[in-house]
Amino acid sequence: MTAIPHQRITSLKGQRQALQQRARTIRAATGTPYSSEVHLLLGQSYLDPASWQELTASGGVRAAVRRAQFVRRYRHLLARLEAAIERYEQHSVAQNSPGAERMP
């Protein structure tokens, strides 16, 4: 069964929020600032509430095409963000593990 368009958009919004929370949790636990890649991708994936609302509420053929294009691009962007967060987490944990050299 295929999700209706606004459910796909809502799902992507939730996925982005979960990724952002994961990055925040890593930063809080390790004290390591976001990598430039994570910071950039969080910025690129941000949409203001009005934009999310417009994507889910609009109707018609043009809106359907716009949503389909958005979903395709946004999934790719979120996959890149997830990979960047995984690298950030690995780097942060390695940097803050016992025995790791600390910079003054």
Over which residues does each language-model region extend?
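Short, charge/polar-rich alpha-helical segments
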Residues: 1-37
